[in-house]
Amino acid sequence: GAWLVTPEYVKAVGKELLDNIQSVVASHPMKGQDALVKKFVQRTGEPFMTQDPLCTYSHVWLIKEAIEQAKSADPKAIREALAKLDISAGPATAAFYPPRVKFDERGRRVGAAPLIVQWQGGEPYTVVPAAVATRPIVWH
């Protein structure tokens, strides 16, 4: 889970014990997001970006899109607009693989797929799927 790829986890366990540990997560920085991650690290002082701030970043953009489509600040109108969204590009999709946000009738994201993150040299990197990996997976 995502708790295995946090700065607090590396502080508690130590870099030397984490190398090659893998975790399945809903979101983690992917290939092509270097500028976003760099900006996050500079602004927060955190050593790397994790699932929580990345998802929050996209969620804010999703709400913005829904408000614009609803043309209203009414929560029910926003909820209805959010349920109808179908976005495949831009910051609203940054946290998700594949980069599409569309919800089914149960409110689940259509086509959602997890990522595998692996600790390498004291930092967690996306290693699977290869199309969005920031580092190749290491097998020992």
Give the predicted meaning of each segment.
Residues G1-H140:
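Extracytosolic ligand-binding ectodomains
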